[in-house]
Amino acid sequence: MANRATSAFLDNPHPVGVNYVDEGSRQFVAVAELLASKLIASSRESDESNSDVPFVQAYSKFADDNPRHLRVKTGGKMANALTNVIRSYYSINAPAIVPQVEIDRLASKATVSGDMYNSYAVFNSVPIVEVLSPAQTTVSIVGSDRADVTMLNTGAGAANITFNFGQIAETVILKGSVPFQLARANQPMPAARFTYKLRPLDGPFIVVLPVGNPLVISATAATRIQVPLAFNKALVESGFQTAMNDGLFDAQNVNYYSSFDEFIIAQYHALDGINRVSTCVVLGLALQAYDQMRRALPVRRV
């Protein structure tokens, strides 16, 4: 095999920090999310009842501020701690670390389990793609939300291209620019078709590459990751976009990801011996809290 190509998107992820992953910090994030969810629910209740009482009570609990300061509505000590915790994970401009005593004090404002692994979510992004091809073929791989594999065969006859997808994703879907043939190694080759759904991924897989026109295969993957039961992917994604817009992830010379799915999958492949996925799960719940807080308190905070 003369040529080897891998997905550049996964080759050099900027690793998320490993701050705030202890039990007390996980408890703080879970409490922040719980109180933020009550804050936004109380805001709607106040609108519907034309009474400030529900919001005042929820805000006082969330913000840890005396009610006489409610007219400011910036979120108080909880908002400051939550914002700084999120900022610290991925930014070279992170503020001072939130003191552990403050984390513990705010975490005691409600009783939650802090269990970050009692449910799961499925994340969709680019899979590991490793392609081995013989001489007189070329292969390139680009993309972040999907991997576009472009192959060209300039030889005298059809070539077998070997694909491997690793063992992290559970399912990979391949879509061709034209119908193509694919089978597991040492298995009969089926008739050509546009789409293949691969599961399990214990390859390798062989693609038949005809001579002539380029073949483009787009690969997307679904990866199941354990998350807390309260984890809401829509709110996490909204919080991720809001935090990006607010500058909480500002950093120089690093990858910027278009979605939280891309972000967590890239961290999944930062194979440096540190479990950064568990950190991303805590960060995701913190972003969910941030999203609800910002919608309940629509003022620019950073």
Curated annotation (Swiss-Prot):
Q: Does the keyword NAD apply?
A: no
Determine if Secreted is one of this entry's keywords. no
The lineage's top-level taxon is Viruses
Q: Which GO terms describe its cellular component?
A: viral capsid
Q: Where in the cell is the protein located?
A: Virion
> What keywords tag this UniProt record?
Capsid protein, Virion
Transmembrane ranges, per UniProt, are none
Function, as annotated, reads: Self assembles to form an icosahedral capsid with a T=13 symmetry, which consists of 230 trimers, with channels at each of its five-fold vertices.
Q: What is this protein called?
A: Intermediate capsid protein VP8
Q: Which organism is it from?
A: Banna virus (BAV)
Q: Which gene encodes it?
A: Segment-8
